[in-house]
Amino acid sequence: RVIVGAGQINFGSPEGPWNHSIRLERKLGPRLHVVALIDPVRENAEKVLRQKRASSAMSSYRDTAVYPDMHAYLATVTSDTRPHVVWIGSPPAFRGSMHEGCDIEKMLADALPGVGVFLEKPVSTSSVGDVMDVDRYIDGKLGPVSVGYMLRYLRVSQKLKQIISDNRLRVMAVNARYVIAYEHLTKQWWWNKSQSLGPVIEQATHFCDLARYFGGEVELDSIIAHSLEHFESPSGLSKLAFDEEACIPAEERVPRVTSATWKYESGAVGSLMHVIALHGRDFFTEIDVFADGYSLRLCDAYNAPVLYVRRPGDDREEVYKYDDDDPFFSEVAGMIDAVEDPSQRHRILTSYDDAARTYAFTWAIRRASEACVAARHRSP
């Protein structure tokens, strides 16, 4: 295996549950052999390797070589060292296009045809057109490709999908709410739209993806969105951990609220509200799916996921909870199984094409909200 990126998504952080390497170790055990770790900051790569070599997973990293970039690594690959899968947790600014320096998918398709590739979300920070170009280029050239929309792998998400399928439900409406606790969100790049692309594309993308997963394809031209901008009266954030006025250019500050509605291709209606408002650490997240006779309510997706189901004939809600559910592990295990056995490709729940559609959806919401802001400013 090859791991791209020595940062928190691949090697863990006290801030959250993400840590792909530890799930790979759990899935593969002694069969895991990481031949390369690619990161432009060699000290970071060496640091995580020292930690791994001092752990019970030492044998998986004993011979891992460090490379500054994909070009340097690919120049060394032989038939004996050709990887089965490349695990990409590097920032999205360095992938998702056909432009040199941001074309890691193209490089892998050309140099290692048939290799499996896992990518974190969002697929890029480039344009939607660039991402669609990549989608077309890698089709049929790479092996299994999985993108890290891990909330699809929650057992409550799968139960919700099963209920829709088993009962042949025609979804009427999807309503998603994503309210973040911002007090400890100190990374200034997140608050800068020129770097993060804003909270819908960078963060609410998970719920936009679930909205597509449960409701179907969205008519992008139907999207209407409003936002609460940093300069509007209710936008003050009393617990912001840094001086936004001194650190973030006014035109790049993120909206405090984004509220969007849309039509699905099926005719159903969808909505999303992303809010930067809560103090403390825990987010409020909830997504409702309605069909004739049914209310399906997925709550607290990040902390303690629960699915509440109301069915025809009973006004009381059924409650579904699953102990020790690790969607990150299910995501990793599904990818590895698909790489090792082509008959298991259905275990991958988000393909590159699927993730590209979610990316286009999030950009359409941002553009719609910006158009609304611009229109209000033009009004006399």
Segment roles from a protein language model:
Residues 1-57:
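N-terminal Rossmann-like dinucleotide-binding module
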Residues 7-9, 151-249, 372:
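Predominantly a Rossmann-like dinucleotide-binding segment in NAD(P)-dependent oxidoreductases
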Residues 35, 84, 172:
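Conserved acidic residues
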Residues 38, 53-59, 82-90, 334-380:
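C-terminal helix-rich "cap/oligomerization" subdomain common to oxidoreductases
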Residues 70-83:
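Short amphipathic alpha-helix with an adjacent loop that forms part of the alpha/beta core around
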Residues 85, 91-152:
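Beta-strand-loop-alpha-helix segment that lines the small-molecule cofactor/substrate pocket
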Residues 195, 202-304, 332-339, 364:
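Contiguous beta-strand/loop segments that form the cofactor/metal-binding neighborhood of enzyme cores
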